[in-house]
């Protein structure tokens, strides 16, 4: 596909939720320690509405990965795309293959343009009191970043490829920011990796919508992979 770096794995079908399968694989790879699962549960966020639902893993999985930098950073686009490839390919496919016994087709598309956000990292990641990544009125700041990323690439992407059940909604979207995630020891101005449902779905071309996303860190290296898989 034009505009993407893609990697495909072939297979069949599996019927368990993707988040638990990927979490198990990430935990097994990066630490054979029971405390890792508890750590991930305690150090990542899930922001969603009560009736928010995500699609369980499908016969054919297609994931879109978008990369975002910040106005106070000077990361090179080629380096960040390469870092995303190193983090995800072929590791994500290998976990899917192992845990599904080769029964899932997984394609990962890493968009080949990096978006530079209009604001600093702290503008999207600062904590207010005990509220993670939120301003004083409770607004979840990284969701603003996610909206900016999606709007930026709205016309450049065939979003229908990531609608896995043909209901008009994007099912798999991973946004990778270039900084270190707060869950791996960053300061209080950094972004916690998370999964979130938009309060109101974003409109996309051709009648598509984006109702949720996962966000994780490129700067956290191997820890970033485990957390990214957890959030997906």
Where are these regions (language model features)?
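Active-site-proximal segment of zinc-dependent metalloprotease catalytic domains
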Residues: 2, 24-32, 36-232
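N-terminal Lys/Arg-rich, disordered targeting/topogenic segments
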Residues: 1-9
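Hydrophobic membrane-insertion alpha-helices, especially the h-region
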Residues: 13-28
């Amino acid at each position: 596909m034009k505009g993407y770096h893609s990697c495909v794995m072939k297979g069949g079908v599996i019927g368990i939720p993707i988040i638990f399968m990927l979490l198990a694989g990430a935990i097994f790879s990066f630490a054979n320690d029971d405390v890792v699962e508890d750590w991930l549960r305690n150090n990542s966020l899930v922001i969603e509405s009560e009736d928010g639902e995500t699609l369980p893993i499908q016969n054919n999985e297609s994931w879109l990965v978008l990369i975002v930098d910040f106005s106070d950073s000077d990361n090179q686009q080629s380096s960040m795309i390469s870092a995303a490839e190193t983090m995800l390919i072929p590791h994500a496919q290998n976990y899917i293959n192992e845990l599904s016994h080769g029964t899932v087709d997984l394609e990962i598309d890493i968009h080949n343009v990096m978006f530079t956000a209009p604001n600093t990292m702290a503008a999207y990641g600062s904590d207010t009191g005990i509220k993670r990544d939120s301003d004083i009125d409770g607004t979840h700041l990284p969701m603003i970043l996610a909206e900016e990323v999606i709007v930026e690439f709205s016309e450049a992407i065939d979003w229908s490829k990531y609608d896995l059940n043909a209901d008009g909604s994007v099912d798999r979207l991973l946004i990778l920011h270039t900084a270190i995630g707060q869950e791996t020891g960053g300061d209080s101005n950094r972004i916690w990796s998370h999964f979130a449902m938009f309060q109101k779905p974003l409109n996309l071309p051709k009648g598509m919508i984006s109702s949720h996303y996962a966000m994780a860190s490129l700067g956290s290296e191997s820890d970033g992979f485990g957390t990214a898989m957890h959030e997906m």
